[in-house]
Amino acid sequence: MAKRNAEKELTDRNWDQEDEAEEVGTFSMASEEVLKNRAIKKAKRRNVGFESDTGGAFKGFKGLVVPSGGGRFSGFGSGAGGKPLEGLSNGNNITSAPPFASAKAAADPKVAFGSLAANGPTTLVDKVSNPKTNGDSQQPSSSGLASSKACVGNAYHKQLAALNCSVRDWIVKHVNTNPLCDLTPIFKDYEKYLANIEQQHGNSGRNSESESNKVAAETQSPSLFGSTKLQQESTFLFHGNKTEDTPDKKMEVASEKKTDPSSLGATSASFNFGKKVDSSVLGSLSSVPLTGFSFSPGNSSLFGKDTTQSKPVSSPFPTKPLEGQAEGDSGECKGGDEEENDEPPKVVVTEVKEEDAFYSKKCKLFYKKDNEFKEKGIGTLHLKPTANQKTQLLVRADTNLGNILLNVLIPPNMPCTRTGKNNVLIVCVPNPPIDEKNATMPVTMLIRVKTSEDADELHKILLEKKDA
């Protein structure tokens, strides 16, 4: 919406004048009949969800979010979502059991787990024995059948059922309240009370319990994620649960592990909390060959069985002997490269020697042009006698060809002076000429030797030969 323009222009002439007072308007309320016909829009949030979905890396994952229906998990169960999680909820939120970590539970264990008397809590036993209280009257779950059979028995079964029901109700209550709670104290207390029950009733209760567990496992309905065989192999064993399987059951489990490997190429092992793992399980795990970043080569689906699994699969990476061999080959290649990449041979300069020279010295020759000295080249200075008893000054370049940089006769009137630290200055007509246009013009030449002693010696010889 555009701003309102100024009604009065402010200038240097009217800046001290007071503005006219404006009348303040009032709002008038519409009648109810008019308001009924109006469409009143209210602000609403576009994405209405749980508070846990507002942020975080796992905000899209809703498998552990507890809906307001009470005790039902949307991530498990049938597709309709009407069946509760088996073994964790009985359809009723029981709030009679206080938390394990409370001081009252530590002082009086009977309050947390119910009465530990021989008869047990009748309310919990009735709820467990009745399959209709498990949340689904038409399809009772296998855990309900197992608990009902466990409850119908001697006093050991009743106390064990009461203990399990109390643990289940406590877990369901507190997990629904806070899914991030720590359940470690539960199993420690469960271990303690289970040991007390077993001390009271001895081995008779354990033997009957193992038989009832076996019957319950046989009558268990198929699960949504796999067969009953996989569930039987991946059962949870808590620390302190001293149930002993019969030899026949051990033989059945061993034969199943040998003949029916897991669909993903590894032997399935049971989850053990605080209990020693059977050596047969470790042996079966160690017998599986390590494939190392490579999948099974058999033509099998994701959840199917692989017929070629027993064959060892070769790793895509080389082993240690191959690595050693590769290192040897690379060493040989490196040696060949080093031989090929040697430094290029240095150019050997064969100096052209003047046999009849009585004086030879390495020097650098300069010539003067435009009031500055320019380098002519590096070579060897030779002083040679001639037939007419004169001295020839010859400077050859240090190359294989031995190009002549300067070749003149020392005349008697040639200027020769000592300059600088190791320089000798002469004036002559250069041959070969420096400037072809002015070939007969004298040019100042500068001869630089290595040391000052060499310069003094050369200057002395030149003066002697010039005078001669």
Curated annotation (Swiss-Prot):
Q: Where are the residues of the annotated region 5 X 2 AA repeats of F-G?
A: 76-304
Give me the stretches of Polar residues compositional bias: 304-317
User: Which residue ranges are recorded for the region named Binding to CDKN1B?
Assistant: 144-206
Q: Where is the RanBD1 domain?
A: 335-468
Q: Could you tell me the keywords of this UniProt record?
A: Acetylation, Isopeptide bond, Membrane, mRNA transport, Nuclear pore complex, Nucleus, Phosphoprotein, Protein transport, Repeat, Translocation, Transport, Ubl conjugation
Stretches with biased composition (Low complexity): 137-148
Glycyl lysine isopeptide (Lys-Gly) (interchain with G-Cter in SUMO2) crosslink site(s): K353
Entry's CDD domains? RanBD_NUP50 (cd13170)
Q: Which residues carry this modification: N6-acetyllysine?
A: K8, K83, K127, K450
Kindly give the membrane topology term recorded for this protein: Peripheral membrane protein
Kindly report the protein's main subcellular placement as a broad class: nucleus
Location of Phosphoserine modifications = S52, S208, S221, S234, S270, S296
Q: Where is the composition biased (Basic and acidic residues)?
A: 1-16, 241-260
Q: Name where the sequence repeats lie.
A: 76-77, 113-114, 225-226, 273-274, 303-304
InterPro entries in the cross-refs: NUP2/50/61 (IPR015007), PH-like_dom_sf (IPR011993), Ran_bind_dom (IPR000156), RanBP1-like (IPR045255)
The organs and tissues expressing this protein are described as: Ubiquitous. Highest levels in testis, peripheral blood leukocytes and fetal liver.
Q: What is known of its domains?
A: Contains FG repeats. FG repeats are interaction sites for karyopherins (importins, exportins) and form probably an affinity gradient, guiding the transport proteins unidirectionally with their cargo through the NPC. FG repeat regions are highly flexible and lack ordered secondary structure. The overall conservation of FG repeats regarding exact sequence, spacing, and repeat unit length is limited.
Record's subunit section: Interacts with Importin alpha-2, Importin beta, Importin beta-2, NUP153, Ran binding protein 7, CDKN1B and itself. Does not interact with TPR.
Q: What does this protein's UniProt record list under function? A: Component of the nuclear pore complex that has a direct role in nuclear protein import. Actively displaces NLSs from importin-alpha, and facilitates disassembly of the importin-alpha:beta-cargo complex and importin recycling. Interacts with regulatory proteins of cell cycle progression including CDKN1B. This interaction is required for correct intracellular transport and degradation of CDKN1B.
Q: What is the designated name of this protein? A: Nuclear pore complex protein Nup50
